[in-house]
Structures are given as C-alpha cells and as structure tokens.
Amino acid sequence: MIKIENVEVMGWEHAIRGMRNPMNSWEKSDSGICKGGDDGIGCENCANYDSCEHTYDHSWQLGKADHDLMMRLADARYRRMITVNLDITAPLYWWKDFYTYEVGIAVDTRSAMSELAAKAFTLDDFSCEHLVDEGDNCWFCNLDVIIDSLNSAREMFLITKDKKYWWQMIQLLPASYHNQKRTVMTNYETLTSVYPMLRNHELDEWVKFCKWIEALPYSCLLYTSD
C-alpha cells in the first residue's frame, strides 16, 4: 500500500526563464495567470486548453509556445527546476527501494523511537494484501502473532522506559510495516529518470507511484507514452 498526498508542483516560471536564457528569448514566453481573456494568458495560447474546465480561476498556466519549446529541447535541464513536494506513506520495503533508486532529493521523517511507541500496532499498520493462509502454511495468521509480540514489547517499553524493549520492536518489525509517512522533495528531471525503470516494477507500490507521475501537471514532459 502507498498513499501520496499534499502534492505541490512549483518552479515553472524559473524553469521557463532558465530554458530561454541561451537564446535570450524571454519575450516569447506566453505563460502566465489565467484570466480567460486577453489580460494574462488567454484560452487561445493555453497549453492546458483541452483538459481545462475554463473556470478562469487566476491560476498559473503554461503557454503553448513555452510548452512547445519544452517538448522540443533535447537537453531538458529545465526539468530540474520544476520541484515537486509531497507526503508519502508506504511500507519499509518500499522505502528501501526508494533510496536505492534515488527518487527524492530531500526527505524529512520522524524518528523511529517516537514513531514506534506512539500507538499500539494493528493489522492496518501493515501492507499484507498478498498474505494468504494455505494448507499448513499460516502466513497471514503469523502476522497476528508478530503484532501481539510487538504490542507486548511496546507496553513494556512504555512502562519501564528500558531501551531493550524498544530493540525488540525494532528488530521484530516486519518490512511490511507501512506507518512510515515522510515528506519528500523531488523534481521533474528525477522523475523522468526513474519512470522507465519503475512503471513495470514487481511491487504494486511502484506501479501506483508511476500512475501518480502520469497524473502530474504536463506529465508529457516526463515520459513518452507507447
């Protein structure tokens, strides 16, 4: 399981200025605030025209000329300046992959000490949708046993403050534990690099992550559909 929320994409104006620096073509930039008419970016030169609901909400929109230049540039360094901030809740086994693929530029997280003791462990804290009980193999019910053991260690830690019980939680905790919410900063260039590697990944979480990439604003700058 993976949960992505509080997404914010920024840096478009800086990226466009930097992209146009080599040719001194800043005056050709046609992006700006949407007002639905000639004051600001109008519908005729809006790159988001086809999918727009035409609410004229004074949001910033990418112009067709800027969009066309972005699509044509072979050296797309401007993507590094389009920053994406988001919160991700995912299991430990996914976070290990996350750092392997270097998806994030910066990550803020809580300390393991405070996080593990904050609440009792429940089945909802684990990604276990693929666990089954089959014949003599009781994989799913074994998780219940582990949860009981974790809660026993947690209670002893809260009562005694003895760190040896905290170690019981740390070293017994399964990689499927997904109560791991972290705030991530990345950019369009990084997402462009990892998308081809991850979109057909064995882990469901990476497939869902790539679906999220596909839904980002102007995601055509990130990947080529085939």
Regions found by a protein language model. Give the residues of each.
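Family-specific signature for flavin-dependent thymidylate synthase
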Residues: 1-225
